[in-house]
Amino acid sequence: TESREISILYHSASASVDANSVSCPTPVTVPVSENEFAHGFFYPPQNTNFDGSPADLPPLIVKSHGGPTGQTTAAFNVKIQYWTSRGFAVLDMNYRGSTGFSRAYRRRLKGAWGCIDVEDCAAGARWLSNQGWVDPQRMAMSGGSAGGYTTLCALTFDNCFSAGASHYGIGDLSALATDTHKFESRYLDGLIGPWPEAEADYRARSPLHHAEGLDCPV
């Protein structure tokens, strides 16, 4: 203004977080085959106001990032802290195909989307169970977009998880290949196979066409 005076219109939120109630991630490396490993971040339950029974292992939520060639990091995530502060353990997976672990690691997803990402998330959950860190009878999975697709595949084609949440996930790969926007219209050629030549693979990996295998809450 002409007066050169500054007026404060809004103040930013000043919510504080008790550092002792923040669950800090532990990097984990999970064996997924004889010579291969997948990576993730494990968050144990943490809340200074409550203690779980020493005899009870916590339930687990496995998170699958989008992309699918994106990545998750150890940065503070309030959504993860929501669950860990309420008694859940969380495994945030960087399955094979994720960015940040070498070109060869990222290229492992080539032609294998809906397969090795699912295998790695299930392997991570089972590995934590074998370590005695989580309850194998109370394991769930969650993801959005490409991570939602991985979640649906895990719930449909694997019996590891008892429940899941797919946020705007993909159920029919053929529909995605034919109806998506132009910028990503050929993206699936590298992740699944060329369309329509590989149509059988698209159908085989689409949870929508195998709904009989989905027998848990979603």
Where are these regions (language model features)?
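A flexible loop/linker signature enriched in serine peptidases of the S9 family
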Residues: 1-2, 72, 97
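Non-catalytic accessory segments flanking enzyme active sites
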Residues: 1-52, 78-81, 85, 174, ...
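Conserved hydrophobic/aromatic pocket- or pore-lining residues that grip, position, or stack substrates
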Residues: 30, 40, 62, 83, ...
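Short beta-strand element of the alpha/beta-hydrolase
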Residues: 44, 52-66
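Serine-hydrolase catalytic-loop signature spanning alpha/beta hydrolases and amidase-signature enzymes
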Residues: 66-70, 90
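Glycine/threonine-rich flexible loop motifs
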Residues: 69-75, 100
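Short amphipathic alpha-helix adjacent to the substrate-entry channel of hydrolases
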Residues: 74-94
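Active-site-proximal cap/loop segments of hydrolase catalytic domains
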Residues: 92-218
